Amino acid sequence: MKKEKAVVVFSGGQDSTTCLFWAMEQFAEVEAVTFNYNQRHKLEIDCAAEIAKELGIKHTVLDMSLLNQLAPNALTRTDMEITHEEGELPSTFVDGRNLLFLSFAAVLAKQVGARHIVTGVCETDFSGYPDCRDVFVKSLNVTLNLSMDYPFVIHTPLMWIDKAETWKLSDELGAFEFVREKTLTCYNGIIGDGCGECPACQLRKAGLDTYLQEREGASN
């Protein structure tokens, strides 16, 4: 893959930034694409742009605001509480988001001569999002190839690893401190370690604490 080109679906968060560093190691040329779907914190887009600029990555932002018209949710509406009731999808789930994001990323990839698409979806720390499942990604990969008659390959480096292992991967890629300090995972829009209270921050911190304990134990 070293001689090929890839497009990374990029939000500026921990997972997609780790995937960006992974792609930079795997491919000769990498571009990033971010989607503006009127998410609650526009800082997410600014954060992604700043990271791409710092890493020298060509960055495209696509307007997907129609998603908010079709599927209002807690990620786009300040009047909706972030909740996750047992047996129900979290209020942060956006119907069709990864389906649309990966489809538009594929269109962009074909236009820029890339056949590889990288996304940070994960089934291990799966929050109940059906569009983060491996079966969905594999199915969409086939559909995209048929729809555009093009040999796309969707890569999911984080699919079978948990948050602690994602931190480990960022460390192996030499990006641990960068990811910890400069990414935005927090639902409340706080860069770095975040608010510590929202579900995204709690998951991120639990993974970080586990990895740091493992790393310390390995060094003793």
UniProtKB/Swiss-Prot annotation:
Spell out the InterPro entries in the cross-references.
QueC, Rossmann-like_a/b/a_fold
Q: How does it assemble?
A: Homodimer.
Cofactor comment text: Binds 1 zinc ion per subunit.
Instruction: Look up and give the organism this protein is from.
Output: Bacillus cereus (strain AH187)
- Family of the protein in this entry: Belongs to the QueC family.
Q: Could you tell me the keywords of this UniProt record?
A: ATP-binding, Ligase, Metal-binding, Nucleotide-binding, Queuosine biosynthesis, Zinc
Q: Does the keyword Zinc apply?
A: yes
Q: In which pathway does it act?
A: Purine metabolism; 7-cyano-7-deazaguanine biosynthesis
General function of this protein? Catalyzes the ATP-dependent conversion of 7-carboxy-7-deazaguanine (CDG) to 7-cyano-7-deazaguanine (preQ(0)).
Q: Which residues are noted in the entry as ATP-binding?
A: 10-20
Q: Which cofactor does it need?
A: Zn(2+)
| Reaction catalyzed | 7-carboxy-7-deazaguanine + NH4(+) + ATP = 7-cyano-7-deazaguanine + ADP + phosphate + H2O + H(+)
Positions with a binding annotation for Zn(2+): 186, 195, 198, 201
Q: What is this protein called?
A: 7-cyano-7-deazaguanine synthase
Q: E.C. number, please?
A: 6.3.4.20
Give one Pfam hit by family name.
QueC
Q: Which GO terms describe its biological process?
A: queuosine biosynthetic process
> Per its record, what are the GO molecular function terms?
ATP binding; ligase activity, forming carbon-nitrogen bonds; zinc ion binding
- Encoding gene per record: queC
